[in-house]
């Protein structure tokens, strides 16, 4: 089967952080999320990177391709998804592991170097959602992981 060819991004001005909206007990990765997205009619996983519970960073959609993760921003952004983000009742919860948060920080530092001037954003900054279930700015600046239900 031929690999799908996606349009390349012409610019990268945002780096969006998402969560998979899964419970802490679910350790899913790019394979499962790709399947979920395909079941919604998408051609591939919408995120460029997935960070598993153990901190493993998995490549999703080609990094230079237009993603499918934030309506209105896909053509100018990279999408990073942390596995987790909801509690047993389905409410937002910053239940990410220390390994995930360390991997996220390292990846974001790399991406900020690669895409000079790109702004770090949470999905809830531009959509009425809780995603990624924590205050990204506070975590980035103060290293404090606090649940947030913006949206």
UniProtKB/Swiss-Prot annotation:
Its main location: host cell. The keyword Cell membrane does not apply. It catalyses: Hydrolyzes the link between N-acetylmuramoyl residues and L-amino acid residues in certain cell-wall glycopeptides. Pfam families: Amidase_2 (PF01510). CDD domains: PGRP. Keywords: Antimicrobial, Bacteriolytic enzyme, Cytolysis, Host cell lysis by virus, Host cytoplasm, Hydrolase, Late protein, Metal-binding, Viral release from host cell, Zinc. Zn(2+) is required for amidase activity. Gene3D superfamilies: Peptidoglycan recognition protein-like (3.40.80.10). Transmembrane segments: none annotated. GO terms for biological process: defense response to bacterium; negative regulation of viral transcription; peptidoglycan catabolic process; viral release from host cell by cytolysis. InterPro entries: Amidase/PGRP_sf (IPR036505), Amidase_domain (IPR002502), Endolysin_T7_type (IPR034689), PGRP (IPR015510), PGRP_domain_met/bac (IPR006619). Optimum pH is 7. Coiled coil: none annotated. GO terms for molecular function: N-acetylmuramoyl-L-alanine amidase activity; zinc ion binding. Endolysin with amidase activity that degrades host peptidoglycans and participates with the holin and spanin proteins in the sequential events which lead to the programmed host cell lysis releasing the mature viral particles. Once the holin has permeabilized the host cell membrane, the endolysin can reach the periplasm and breaking down the peptidoglycan layer. Plays an important role in the switch between viral transcription and genome replication. Once produced in sufficient amount, interacts with and inhibits the viral RNA polymerase that becomes unable to produce additional late transcripts. This lysozyme-polymerase complex in turn plays an active role in viral genome replication and packaging. This is Endolysin. It comes from Klebsiella phage KP32. The lineage of its organism: Viruses, Duplodnaviria, Heunggongvirae, Uroviricota, Caudoviricetes.
